């Protein structure tokens, strides 16, 4: 077996409502004065105050619709390559129909869990592993009544996510990706576990 890394473009819908509500912080921190100066120079750029640490630019996080290089990835797998793809979620692109339908990059961030879920679907995987810093998904995380969850149906997971039981920028995206994968085809399972116990998780 050989390993290959594929720089991956992810097609998004240019009309995704996320583009009107940028939420993903990127780049360095700035002072309020600097941030307002940047926004005055280019009104398309949005900066917000970030947890008392300064101001950062925020961009959209649209839903991934298609992996542009999916055929290349599958061809590599068929030829016994270990493929590294969708790094960081992938590069967000949209169709530019004013330029023969070519792809063009957009200022956005693809959620890496949803990007990985789409890749798992394209590879016709039966199981998706999402590895993180904790061993279990939990409700009431970090509280005295924290409860670690072992097995959930997609409906149960969705109910808990809708109740706000999971961290918005940490566990909730993983749970949402797990739900999407489990519902994409009968018999599919997603396992969320600790990176340092990946071998045990996959056993």
What spans do the regions from the language model cover?
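C-terminal catalytic "cap/lid" subdomain
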Residues: 1-203
């Amino acid at each position: 077996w050989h390993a290959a890394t594929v720089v991956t473009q992810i097609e998004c819908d240019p009309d995704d409502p996320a583009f009107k509500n940028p939420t993903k912080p990127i780049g360095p921190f700035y002072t309020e004065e600097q941030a307002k100066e940047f926004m005055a120079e280019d009104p398309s750029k949005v900066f917000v105050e970030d947890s008392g640490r300064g101001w950062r630019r925020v961009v959209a996080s649209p839903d991934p619709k298609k992996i542009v290089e999916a055929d290349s990835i599958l061809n590599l797998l068929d030829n016994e390559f270990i493929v590294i793809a969708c790094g960081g979620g992938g590069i967000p692109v949209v169709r530019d129909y004013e330029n023969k339908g070519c792809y063009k990059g957009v200022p956005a961030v693809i959620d890496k869990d949803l990007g990985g879920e789409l890749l798992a679907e394209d590879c016709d995987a039966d199981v998706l592993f999402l590895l993180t810093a904790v061993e279990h998904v939990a409700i009431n995380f970090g509280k005295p009544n924290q409860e670690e969850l072992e097995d959930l149906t997609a409906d149960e997971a969705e109910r808990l996510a809708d109740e706000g039981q999971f961290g918005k920028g940490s566990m909730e995206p993983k749970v949402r990706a797990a739900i999407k994968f489990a519902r994409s085809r009968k018999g599919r399972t997603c396992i969320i576990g600790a990176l340092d116990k990946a071998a045990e998780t996959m056993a």
